């Protein structure tokens, strides 16, 4: 459903206030540091309000408050069991965000209380199905850091200010056309990415690119059993797929521990139940999770041209063994492609963003590329994107689409969208219309002059499996023919104008006595 202008204004106002609150924490910290605190506090407020709602539902009709019920041992154990079943954790009454706000108002709050409370959330899940989704979730929010203040009093004062300001914000996460809280969290992640420089690519894919990837892997699907991102970052790309169609389960792997925590928070905050997502913290290529599984949709924006070991052991790894070559140590791009293809279901769709080098580099990469096209016929489309649309890098990128269910005579679609963008101050952007043009062209699989081309497998073979887009999409603009007669006439007119101007100048000089008659 489209959002109203009023809701759009509410969003903008909420975003403005959130970023102002985030700046209260800035101090001597860089963006990657104070990001952990502001996102952690927003998330803790969410957990608290979620728990309060569950407690209210569980006690409806009981004529007893949550605090009173918790004081009764029998009620308390029933409430714990109910909360664990419904949301995967529980929070004691005195540890709720709202309870701490009351402590701040009476000047009874201590930052140590918050530190203890977040540890208790994690330990409440021990031995439960939700344990892996919560353990270590707040490990990057170091409330004892001197960056927050030199002593407990200073740290308490700063965190109290942030908590009070957050408490004033209208986070509503039910009965709304738009997920205000989820949207606010995505806004914060995006803003932090914009200030994080080269590190931004580790955890965030711009929303318009995410939209393209998500629309591609959900094309023709009214639901997906599962979607998998092997380099899931903050989880935003996975969640974007859920905005396009119904997704039952989300799977991801992320090497960076801080980003892994962010992804789990993002899932929970978007009301994905703990049993409906599985995010793992490890190196995808070296220690892959989910072996033996395949997925309806596989989607990723992996680190570009990253290094990997390319160890000889991988020659017998079922992800890579059929290709005859391993991706080079200095560029893991094709290792990620091979990994993703291995996890793709026979009827699924895969979309991955990578630098243009994967289209034409030779040696081992050329062998792998040829195998995927000639032997397997998995390549569905190549989409060239504009330069400078990603955080942290200005290089042009492309989207590769793969399917295992292609027919032998299916063509491969090439789209050159490299010149379709809105120029920004520091970064280029894709408009909604430009995104829709890409998606519409992909769905129609049509050839459009100077924009797209549907190539046969034989044409690709004739190009020696080089996928460089200009080989297939001719964007050359012919210059208008030059009318030499008109050019000659223009030159005569210019000479005439020069002569007239010289006469005027000479006349003025004579009046001034500078130039005498000859």
Question: Residue ranges of each PLM-predicted region?
Answer:
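Conserved S-adenosyl-L-methionine
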Residues: 199-300, 305-323, 334-335, 354-357, ...
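Conserved catalytic network of the ASCE P-loop NTPase/AAA+ motor domain
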Residues: 220, 290-291, 343-344, 392-393, ...
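Conserved P-loop NTPase
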Residues: 399, 403-438
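Hydrophobic alpha-helical scaffolding
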Residues: 152, 174, 252-256, 297, ...
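Non-catalytic, mostly N-terminal accessory regions of nucleic-acid modification and defense proteins
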Residues: 1-212, 216-217, 275-284, 289, ...
């Amino acid at each position: 459903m489209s959002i109203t202008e009023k809701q759009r204004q509410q969003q903008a106002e909420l975003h403005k206030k959130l970023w102002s609150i985030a700046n209260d924490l800035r101090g001597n910290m860089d963006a990657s540091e104070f990001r952990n605190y502001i996102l952690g506090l927003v998330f803790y407020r969410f957990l608290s309000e979620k728990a309060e709602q569950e407690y209210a539902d569980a006690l409806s009709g009981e004529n007893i408050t949550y605090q009173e019920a918790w004081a009764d041992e029998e009620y308390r154990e029933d409430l714990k069991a109910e909360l664990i079943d419904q949301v995967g954790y529980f929070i004691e009454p005195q540890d709720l965000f709202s309870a701490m706000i009351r402590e701040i108002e009476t000047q009874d709050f201590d930052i140590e209380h918050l530190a203890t409370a977040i540890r208790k959330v994690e330990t409440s899940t021990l031995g439960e199905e939700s344990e892996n989704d919560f353990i270590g979730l707040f490990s990057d929010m170091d409330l004892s850091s001197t960056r927050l203040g030199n002593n407990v009093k200073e740290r308490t004062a700063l965190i109290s200010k942030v908590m009070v300001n957050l408490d004033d914000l209208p986070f509503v996460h039910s009965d709304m056309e738009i997920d205000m809280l989820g949207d606010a969290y995505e806004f914060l992640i995006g803003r932090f990415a914009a200030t994080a420089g080269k590190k931004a690519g580790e955890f965030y894919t711009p929303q318009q690119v995410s939209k393209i990837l998500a629309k591609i892997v959900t094309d023709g699907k009214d639901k997906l059993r599962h979607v998998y991102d092997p380099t899931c970052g903050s989880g935003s790309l996975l969640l974007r797929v859920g905005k396009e169609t119904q997704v039952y389960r989300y799977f991801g792997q992320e090497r960076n521990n801080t980003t892994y925590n962010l992804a789990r928070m993002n899932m929970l905050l978007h009301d994905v139940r703990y049993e409906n997502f599985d995010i793992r913290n490890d190196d995808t290529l070296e220690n892959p999770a989910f072996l033996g599984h395949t997925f309806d949709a596989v989607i990723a924006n992996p680190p570009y041209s990253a290094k990997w070991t390319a160890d000889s052991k991988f020659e017998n790894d079922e992800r890579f063994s059929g290709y005859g070559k391993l991706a080079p140590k200095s560029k893991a791009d094709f290792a990620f492609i091979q990994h993703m293809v291995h996890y793709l279901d026979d009827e699924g769709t895969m979309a991955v963003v990578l630098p243009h080098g994967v289209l034409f580099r030779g040696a081992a990469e050329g062998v792998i590329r040829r195998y995927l096209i000639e032997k397997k016929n998995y390549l569905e489309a190549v989409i060239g994107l504009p330069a400078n649309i990603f955080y942290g890098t200005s290089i042009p990128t492309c989207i590769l689409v793969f399917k295992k269910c292609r027919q032998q005579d299916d063509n491969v679609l090439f789209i050159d969208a490299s010149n379709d963008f809105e120029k920004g101050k520091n970064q280029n952007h894709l408009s909604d219309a430009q995104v829709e043009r890409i998606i519409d062209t992909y769905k129609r699989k049509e050839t459009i002059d100077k924009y797209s081309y549907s190539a046969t497998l034989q044409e690709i073979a004739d190009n020696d499996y080089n996928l460089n887009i200009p080989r297939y999409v001719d964007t050359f603009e012919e210059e208008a023919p030059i009318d030499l007669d008109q050019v000659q006439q223009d030159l005569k007119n210019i000479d005439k104008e020069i002569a007239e101007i010289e006469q005027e100048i000479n006349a003025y000089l004579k009046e001034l006595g500078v130039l005498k008659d000859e």
